[in-house]
Every structure is written in structure tokens, then in C-alpha cells.
Amino acid sequence: MASKPEKRVASSVFITLAPPRRDVAVSEEVGQAACEARRARPWEMLPTKTPGAAVGRSPKTWTPSGKTNASLSGVTPQLSNGGCSLPPPSLNEEDLDLPPPPPPPSAYLPLPEEEPPVLPGKSLISDLEQLHLPPPPPPPPPQAPSKGSSVHPPPGHAIPSEEELPPPPEEPVTLPEREVSTDVCGFCHKPVSPRELAVEAMKRQYHAQCFTCRTCRRQLAGQRFYQKDGRPLCEPCYQDTLEKCGKCGEVVQEHVIRALGKAFHPPCFTCVTCARCISDESFALDSQNQVYCVADFYRKFAPVCSICENPIIPRDGKDAFKIECMGRNFHENCYRCEDCSVLLSVEPTDQGCYPLNDHLFCKPCHLKRSAAGCC
């Protein structure tokens, strides 16, 4: 009794294909990997014996619609990504009653069309226009980064090379103020550094240690000082250079009155007769250099006219002249002939004075008195 043939089911192998890529090198690697995988399965390359060969019909293989067995048997189909497709599995008699398997999916998957990227700002404006809302205000202009701050570009943006960047503007190198001092010390004639203590006095700059009294070398920084002949002096040394009062002997510091080659305090320069302060008025001196006011001096030392017996002094701002004759003093207006009262001249002429026995006469009266034997 013949044994019943065994049922054999050929297992089908499904290969999940990766989506195609644009990189040619990667596609070739995938095709080579698929071919190597096929070579690694020798059982698929061996011919399979169909147990139904004794029945008298050859098994039929399924072919896709629109293609014949002749076109499929002679050429091994290749995928678009460079891989090799597996041959269709062999079927037995029991498998012929099964419905044909669904057609395999297409190896080529079309790439979606690339759409231009939509900026978020334009999509936001279009949405606002549909809602009848005003568009947002434009973004502020980019501000130049401050010095010392680092700017990081957003991800996905390439940083331009150094050749593409514009050269930085050339800024003049400026030194801080007073770093290089042009002031020179008025005493040692060396530069005054801005970091050193300095004193400004008498329109010049000095080191603090150089601004001293020129007599006793006392430090004058922050102290009261005096200037004499362009030299700074402390108060004691300055007072030693001042003049002493010609009457009291004290130093004259404020207002000074100079007379007789000396200096006086205003209260010390007074008249010796009335003790009135003369100040800047006119004064007179006697033989002992004593000071008198003009009025007291004339009252004491002015000559007295022998005719009117009044002192001969200037009046109403006019100078007064005295005439001396025979040891007597006369005013100009009092110098007349005692007989005819004619004004006598001081010149030795006919209109001059012709005295006779201590009397003043003109020439005609003098001759008349002499002839008469009078006086």
C-alpha cells in the first residue's frame, strides 16, 4: 500500500522594506545587504520537489496582474532601492485551492511634495485677519550688542566665518583723564602726578610736601599762608617782614600811613596839638618833625602881619605870600605907603618901598618927608 504523501507547507518570508532615501550610497548598501542575505539562505536556492508530480499537472504559480510568467521567470526583479526581491514560493496541490495572496505592496513609496515653510509671523497675521483683528506691531529693530556681551546665534543657523564679518571699527585709544599730567610743581619743577596730593595756590601746582614756608620750611598744605614777592610764607614769618609803626612800634598789618619815611597805624598818626587823626589829610612838620594839622601849624608858626596883626595863612584854597621888610611881615595887600596908601611893589623900582625911620613910603612921599625934615 502506497504511503500517503506528506503535506508540506512552504513558509513565506516577508521582508520589511525601509522607505527610500536620497542618499545613493546608503541605497547601494541596502541592496548589497539584501543580496548577501539571499546568498546566506541556500535552502531557498535549491529546487523543491512537488509531491503532486504524479497527478500529471504542473503547479501553477501566482503572477501579478498584467505580467506573464515569462517576464518574471527570466529576470530577477530588483527593487528601486537596489535590493533583490525573493522568488515566489512553490505551492503543492493543497495550496492550489487557497485564494491567491494579496499583491505585495509597491516597493517605491512616493515622497511627499516639499512645501515651502510658512513663517509663524505670516500665519499669525492671516489668522488675525480672519478674526478681523489688527495685526501685531512690527518687531523693534535689532539693537547693537553692548560691549562685553556675547551673542549666541539661534539653533540651525550657521555662524559666518571670520572672512565674512566686517572689520571692527578702529576706535582711537584714549587714556583716562589726568593719567599723564602736564602740571609741573612750582617748587621742585617735577611733574605732579594725579595720584599724588597736590596744592593749587598762586596760580600754580605744588606737591603737598613742596608747598612750605620759604623762611622756616613749615608745611602750608591746609594752613593759612601769605604771599610776598611770589613766595608763600606762614603767618609768623609774614609778620616779621611787615613794617613797625613809627609811634607805637607794633606791626602794621592792615591800613598803613606812610610819612617821614615810616609807617604808622591810622590812630597813631595824629596832630600833636589837637590829637586829631590826620589820616590822609595834609599835615605840617615843625623843626623837631612833630606832626601838626594845617590849622594848628599856622596858628602856632604862621607869621603875623605888622599892619593888621593877623597870621599870614592861605585862605579859600589860595596861597598866601608874606612880604618881609625891615624885619616885619606884611600881607601883599597890606604892603602900602603910609602917607598915600599906594600899593608898593616888591621890585626895586620907582613904585617900590622907600622906608624912612621904620615907616613905609613911596618915592614921592619919601622925598617930601625928607625935605620937610619930618620923621
Swiss-Prot record:
Region (FERMT2-binding): 278-375
Biased composition (Pro residues): 98-107, 133-144
Cytoplasm is among the record's keywords: yes
Primary location group: other
Record gene name: Fblim1
Biased composition (Polar residues): 60-83
Start and end residues of each stretch annotated as Filamin-binding: 1-69
Stretches for region Disordered: 40-176
Organism: Mus musculus (Mouse)
Entry superkingdom: Eukaryota
Record note on quaternary structure: Interacts with FERMT2, FLNA, FLNB and FLNC. Interacts with NKX2-5.
GO molecular function, one term: filamin binding
Disulphides: none
Keyword annotations: Cell adhesion, Cell junction, Cell shape, Cytoplasm, Cytoskeleton, LIM domain, Metal-binding, Repeat, Zinc
One term under GO cellular component: cell periphery
GO biological process: cell-cell adhesion; regulation of cell shape; regulation of integrin activation
Protein name (Swiss-Prot/TrEMBL): Filamin-binding LIM protein 1
Pfam families reported in the protein's UniProt record: LIM
